[in-house]
Amino acid sequence: MNFTVGFKPLLGDAHNMDNLEKQLICPICLEMFSKPVVILPCQHNLCRKCANDVFQASNPLWQSRGSTTVSSGGRFRCPSCRHEVVLDRHGVYGLQRNLLVENIIDIYKQESSRPLHAKAEQHLMCEEHEDEKINIYCLSCEVPTCSLCKVFGAHKDCEVAPLPTIYKRQKSELSDGIAMLVAGNDRVQAVITQMEEVCQTIEDNSRRQKQLLNQRFETLCAVLEERKGELLQALAREQEEKLQRVRGLIRQYGDHLEGSSKLVESAIQSMEEPQMALYLQQAKELINKVGAMSKVELAGRPEPGYESMEQFSVSVEHVAEMLRTIDFQPGAAGDEEDDDMALDGEEGNAGLEEERLDVPEGSGLH
């Protein structure tokens, strides 16, 4: 069945247009939504400008988007349902745009701007019976047709129904389908919002765990530095004690050497004395001094190996091996000190498990 194609406006008659316009009114400015349109967590829509005005009124100390001051966000209530809307530091610019509503507004404005004669319903005429309007619907062939086609033409054996009846039925089906699609879009939008919140929570939790990880490794480094300082002090004390003893012996031996050298010099000068009487006057005393000097017992020398410092060697291989085994413990609750390390301005770890470092026992680095 062939017929001339006409059309009705996409959005229906003036009554439907008025109903649609009512759905596109912003509850704040009472005008049609102006783009961009943002969707709140409660699924109500606002002009972003209007949402920002309400947000600024509820948060007078919050800095505007162009300010260099960092803000921690704020909150306001939806004017439609009074649901509290919590915003991050981006303010209303962090809200999701409702592209579906924006597209509907564009279509509405396009339809509203059509000339009146273009909006008038055009009748479809049957091509086989040029003077007959399309006024019935063939249920068997699922096409519109005219009465003559049913009486004399190709559809005389088909089951037909009045065109308005099928029109209302299919329009109702399409309307239900649109409602389901819009509801589905709302659910998808809600899921997107939830997943964006999950992304934000993942970033917050990761940032917190990174800070805890850095703090714990800094603690390990501090323990190592403290222990290294203690061992270096012990080594320095031993070094000083040994050096003092050896240097004391060096001074004692030096004093003895100096006295012995002077005595040798005096004895040699005495032996060069040509007069026997004068020599004999000094010889007895010198002989006694030389004998006494040769019998002087000096303090003992350092025992063999006294200079060795091998007892201060440190084996760190086993500790290093333990450190290499440090790993995460998925699902383990954080230590008690974790509660004292809460980061300013960070919230929400619900549903996500913390991971903490597993430091092997016996490493001395807990």
Curated annotation (Swiss-Prot):
The Gene Ontology biological process annotation of the record reads: cell differentiation; negative regulation of microtubule depolymerization
Q: Where in the cell is it found?
A: Cytoplasm, Cytoskeleton; Cytoplasm, Myofibril, Sarcomere, Z line
Which residues lie within the region annotated Disordered? 328-366
For bias type Acidic residues, the affected ranges are: 334-347
Q: Which UniProt keywords apply?
A: Coiled coil, Cytoplasm, Cytoskeleton, Developmental protein, Differentiation, Metal-binding, Microtubule, Zinc, Zinc-finger
Residue numbers spanned by region Mediates microtubule-binding and homooligomerization: 168-211
GO molecular function list: microtubule binding; zinc ion binding
What GO cellular component entries does it have?
microtubule; microtubule associated complex; Z disc
Where Zn(2+) binds, per the record, is at 126, 129, 149, 155
Q: What is this protein called?
A: Tripartite motif-containing protein 54
Residue spans annotated as Zn fingers (RING-type) read 26-82
Which regions form coiled coils? 194-258
Domain named COS is located at 271-329
Key word Cytoplasm present: yes
Map the zinc fingers (B box-type) to residue ranges. Answer: 121-163
The record, for InterPro entries, names: COS_domain, TRIM/RBCC, Trim54_Bbox2_Zfn, TRIM54_RING-HC, Znf-RING_euk, Znf_B-box, Znf_RING, Znf_RING/FYVE/PHD
Output the CDD domains linked to this UniProt entry: Bbox2_MuRF3_C-II, RING-HC_MuRF3
Q: Which PROSITE patterns match?
A: COS (PS51262), ZF_BBOX (PS50119), ZF_RING_1 (PS00518), ZF_RING_2 (PS50089)
